[in-house]
Amino acid sequence: MKIDPQISIFVNGNSHLYQLRGVIYFGGQHFVARLVEQDSTVWYHDGIITGRNMIYEGQLESVDLKHCCDGKTPSALFYTRILHQS
């Protein structure tokens, strides 16, 4: 699976740009997540291990989003639309 940091979707002939904001992983009957901030900072969350806290993992370009702890695989990707200011 290829995970793009940005995707473009065409609606009625107009291109809309979306930026990756999160990846949900599943494996071993358990979900974990990575969250991506607007500045491309990546955080890891596992409610069982980290509780309410997140662990800093680095900048988006240096984190392998296709693989996660204990062999968990990506199950869902979340993107938000980038609104252009005029």
Give the ranges of each region predicted by the language model.
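Disordered, polybasic Ser/Thr-rich segments at the N-terminal boundary of pleckstrin homology
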Residues: 1-15
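Conserved catalytic-core surface of thiol
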Residues: 13-86
